């Protein structure tokens, strides 16, 4: 079962995909946010192209586990996705995923300019890999 992981921000959406067996996550692309319609169309294209069967959305939470203002924006985004795309959607705690992605890119000696371009899809991959590693389905 192929799963699409999303790291939803105000300006970008990081997209990652699992392999068909659901073992590993790879960063796919960073969608520059435009209109909600264009965002949904691009997600639908990816879903069709890669035969995605489930969507996992990173849920930003405060360190105490509560949902803050960014989490509310993500919940609103999920509602828009549900209106346009008929797939199961789950959320996953994304706390510190961007920090983990940044550390991986630094360890791989990726330049600061390049990191800025790929950090969101790497964060999506970290979120998705955490979900896959947990065995949750």
From Swiss-Prot:
GO biological process: rRNA 5'-end processing
UniProt main location, coarse: cytoplasm
Keyword entries, A-Z: Cytoplasm, Hydrolase, Nuclease, Ribosome biogenesis
Keyword Hydrolase attached: yes
CDD domains listed in its UniProt record: YqgF
GO cellular component: cytosol
Protein name, per record: Putative pre-16S rRNA nuclease
């Amino acid at each position: 079962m192929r799963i699409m992981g999303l790291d939803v921000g105000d300006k970008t959406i990081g997209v990652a995909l699992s392999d068909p067996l659901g073992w590993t996550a790879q960063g796919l692309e960073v969608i520059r946010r435009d209109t909600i319609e264009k965002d949904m169309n691009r997600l639908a294209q990816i879903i069709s192209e890669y035969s995605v069967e489930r969507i996992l959305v990173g849920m930003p939470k405060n360190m105490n586990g509560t949902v803050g203002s960014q989490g509310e924006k993500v919940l609103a985004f999920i509602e828009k996705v549900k209106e346009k795309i008929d797939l199961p959607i789950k959320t996953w705690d994304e706390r510190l995923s961007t920090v983990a992605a940044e550390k991986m890119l630094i360890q791989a000696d990726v330049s600061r300019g390049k990191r800025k371009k790929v950090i969101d899809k790497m964060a999506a991959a970290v979120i998705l890999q955490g979900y896959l590693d947990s065995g949750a389905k």
